[in-house]
């Protein structure tokens, strides 16, 4: 055994102890001066490699055996956190980050005699290799200042690597060299010049690049997709039920192009309904391990920005041959259900099919028909009876889900109005029952497919949603109690408890506030190859089946189900799908998280762009959050800003139980109205600051 191996074995066998170099020499058995020097040289090498740790005070060495692997989250002040999960995030002092940058996956060890402190040992993989920032070129220096202040170092740009970017422009930079510690700058090259900041188009492109989003596909993927865009032939129709004579139609947003679901309904003589949910058969065109499939797996999901879409599949597929366009023959996978008057699914069947949609409806058109608009009903008289039956069935399904404990949150969706590179208005988007109608039908199909897979013992990508964390639930109930809403409590967390709380809140001025806090209390839904149910939907068995154009998880579900219903589920196929379900669930969950973050960021940037147009204007909003350093205020159009405690006045105390700031004269609590003026906007940090518009003593008299 050589010296290096001997040192590592001694330290590994005594992981809780530290040794001086002299002690290690004695244990190894080295006696000569040259041998002792060799031990010291090896210790220095191992310390540089982070295989051995050296205590700065005692000079003793100990094993660098890792306690685990985690993602490092940086902070502009140099320190960081290790995101462990389960509420166990660890603090890393600046001196102990050892070259880790925001987003990196690292190994770490917990520091003895501390509760929540750790040291980074090694970098497993870099989380950020391309970032967006502002080019800073002056006095001979060339650096990119990252937009994300969690990435603590500016990136040095060598000569001839700046693409002739100008000082102050937004650029994308690829990092080629990372330093061994955070005292030096990373080195990179500019790969795209986005333009000068100020235009919302430049801002949106910056968000897209920072999250690695693009609507451009590799040439080989586009070429392969183009080959799929051919007329449906007799071979394509083999083994499919021909539903082209049925009244099947799509209902989507006015701007939607990737129409992946269509519906039909028939009211039977015995009072039951036959509901058909017909989903684009993307699996017919995208084969496992092909070029399109590899790219779709990498992307995981389509991402939607206010003025852009970054699709999972090439446009020739998602907007073309896979999109269920009216009057066009399309290959589909149909889930057909017989449902009784109580919303019970008496029978369900899944089979390959071919359809021809008779109408391409928008939600607004359908809502007009459901509301009895005479012009709309006259224009679409051929399907009014079917839409009326759909309306009745959707009400039945919604009532049934509510009774079993479905928690029906109201999401704050908005539409942005653009003009001249600016956002000039933010308009809250109202969801009417036409949206709920499609939602109910999709949920019914997703449940039926998941239950079929579970009953047959098939591998599956389930959509799971665990119960909320009990501590977060306690905080929620405390907030509700603080605003005078009494909630029944039970030992077992059940959706009916939260549903009851939401209904009580609906009758108060605090509804949207409680709705938002309750949403944050929920666990994040994710994909899994193991079924644990879906808490929010009060469903014991659930999957995503209805959007294979834009979600990779749905595409995998289609492959599994289609193979099974066509009688082709061999042992070899079963084993392959087990592996596919596991890897796809992990990838789809990870990509969904990135997509959600990117979409939120895009919305926040648009709201900041709008806020720049209303600087100095005054509005009345509701306090949506209270922290020790101030209050968050949300305007009626969902734009949120911050009023610092200093602006509220002196002597304020933070009451964390009642979530309010108060002094002898006034109290600022959740849901209170506040008159504010838009003071400043930091678009890069997505932060809006408000000032009080009137004296604090007068705030509570706002009507």
Describe the function of each predicted region:
Residues 1-276, 283-328, 658-669, 675, ...:
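Charge-lined substrate channels and their catalytic hotspots, especially those that engage the 3′ end
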Residues 26, 178-179, 196, 205-213, ...:
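Electropositive polyanion-binding surfaces
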